[in-house]
Amino acid sequence: MRTYENKDELKKEINKSFAKYIFEFNDIPESLKDKRVDEVDRTPAENLAYQVGWTTLVLKWEADERKGLHVKTPSDDFKWNQLGELYQWFTDTYAYLSLQELKDMLNDNINSIYAMIDSLSEEELFKPHMRKWSGEATKTAVWEVYKFIHVNTVAPFGTFRTKIRKWKKKHYNSEVVLLNKMEILI
């Protein structure tokens, strides 16, 4: 997993990967937000809903700990062996929104994650056992807070950018094939 020298380096990497990811949605019309294509597991709305869901959880973990609440990861209603159900919950909770609403929510979450990073000391961000929620999140490993931020921002922004690019390619290629077939019939 990628490591970072300091907060600024982490924020720059989030910014870079987020900008590339979110840009891919600029040319997808709202009418296609729920369109399925072969070989791609998520629609554009589901793709964004996944990102909104995970970034919302990261922010909730930190907010709840600051309030003195016990944090259950990944969420109060799901265990780590129920990620499929959690992903479906993300879809059910967020994917009905417009692409613009989803992009706005994700942008707000990323800005809140920047503020969260700024509010933590370098030690709290990069050393283990500095947050209960990060230390107790998994049974097999203790992760520093920055790792949870990385795997819920930088890493999926890259992976899901590839998925949405594939979605666009498959969708627009199928449109070209359909138009070519129509021309042949005419």
Model-based region annotation:
Residues R2-E5, L86-Q100, K139-K147:
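Acidic/His metal-coordination segments adjacent to aromatic residues that form catalytic metal sites
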Residues M1-K20:
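Extreme N-terminal tail/first-helix region
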